[in-house]
Amino acid sequence: MTKAVHTKHAPAAIGPYSQGIIVNNMFYSSGQIPLTPSGEMVNGDIKEQTHQVFSNLKAVLEEAGASFETVVKATVFIADMEQFAEVNEVYGQYFDTHKPARSCVEVARLPKDALVEIEVIALVK
């Protein structure tokens, strides 16, 4: 059984995909970039962009019946590995006691020239 997830509290997909999908008791998010729910890009520094990404992730996780506490894996894409520590600083505010598995990779470019994109896999409550 699969179910697409959509919430107006996170930006709409900018391509032919859903904000996330539930398969059985697992939620797989699409990558979130620092767009506001209205679709405007947050053009601040890496910390501001990362906070917006987490706001978007929170919205899709909640819509799926999951939360940061049920995330089992996160994948972080950053445009510049020199900003790894700053991303980690913000990331740790959302995963302070619960620490899911994670990968972090530097990429040549992200959609809309974002500095960071994060996707998660979580258990649905």
Swiss-Prot record:
Stored SUPFAM superfamilies:
YjgF-like
One GO location term (cellular component): cytosol
GO MF entries: 2-iminobutanoate deaminase activity; 2-iminopropanoate deaminase activity; deaminase activity
Please list the reactions this protein catalyses.
2-iminobutanoate + H2O = 2-oxobutanoate + NH4(+); 2-iminopropanoate + H2O = pyruvate + NH4(+)
GO biological process, any: response to toxic substance
Q: Where is this site: Important for catalytic activity at high pH?
A: 117
What EC number(s) does this enzyme carry? Answer: 3.5.99.10
Residues where substrate binds: 102
Q: In which pathway does it act?
A: Amino-acid biosynthesis; L-isoleucine biosynthesis; 2-oxobutanoate from L-threonine
Q: Which InterPro entries match?
A: RidA, RidA_CS, RutC-like_sf, YjgF/YER057c/UK114
User: Which top EC class is named for this enzyme in its record?
Assistant: hydrolase
What the entry lists under Pfam families is as follows: Ribonuc_L-PSP
Locate the site labelled Stabilizes the substrate.
17
| Key words, A-Z | Amino-acid biosynthesis, Branched-chain amino acid biosynthesis, Cytoplasm, Detoxification, Hydrolase, Isoleucine biosynthesis
Report the main location listed first in the record. Answer: cytoplasm
Subcellular localization(s) per the UniProt record:
Cytoplasm
Q: Which family does it belong to?
A: Belongs to the RutC family.
Q: What is this protein's function?
A: Accelerates the release of ammonia from reactive enamine/imine intermediates of the PLP-dependent threonine dehydratase (IlvA) in the low water environment of the cell. It catalyzes the deamination of enamine/imine intermediates to yield 2-ketobutyrate and ammonia. It is required for the detoxification of reactive intermediates of IlvA due to their highly nucleophilic abilities. Involved in the isoleucine biosynthesis.
Give the quaternary structure: Homotrimer.
Q: This chain belongs to which protein, by name?
A: 2-iminobutanoate/2-iminopropanoate deaminase
